[in-house]
């Protein structure tokens, strides 16, 4: 299986919706345009590359995350991977529910609020992430996936360390972001042709 998803009803960790690991066995299925209310979505790229498009005011901005990059979408932010299947890549993804801001990851109210505030104030979409953070995230995922209470407690500690370190990350310098007005089906057709005909 090229993906493993740990859902909130299984892991029961406050503030963590889904925690997923996608391996590079098969290209990803295109993700349609959508948003999440009260949820920050994080994609930690291990290897390969993954494009995501963020929509704002009828303008689509393209971001390309590669190995050791973190891509973030914020609550109510429209995003998609486009109409074309993604390249093979490995990444961890998580959805953080900020409605749990008083008990986020089981932290007390004070620290929970601080961590949620820090996450909401990350103002870029793309950041460099260290291999130690990826390693801690992999450990967190493995421990939480075992399903025992003791393993979950240890896994949450690793996950909390990763999330608490994110506000120290350096943003990826502005790429050649593609800003396009989305008012024409012809534009979509031309873009598809340009990307798929050699």
Cite the ranges covered by each PLM segment.
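Polar low-complexity intrinsically disordered regions
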Residues: 1, 59-60, 176-180
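A hydrophobic/aromatic-rich effector-binding and dimerization subdomain
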Residues: 1-22, 78-149, 168-172
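Intrinsic-disorder/low-complexity regions
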Residues: 8, 67-68, 184, 195
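A general marker of short, structured functional hotspots
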Residues: 18, 31-32, 39, 123, ...
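N-terminal regulatory/effector-sensing and dimerization cores
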Residues: 21-117, 151-152
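Amphipathic, well-ordered alpha-helical segments in soluble domains
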Residues: 41-44, 133-140, 158, 162-165
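Short, Lys/Arg-enriched, Trp-marked, Pro/Gly-tolerant hinge/linker segments that flank
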Residues: 120-131, 145-159, 163-198
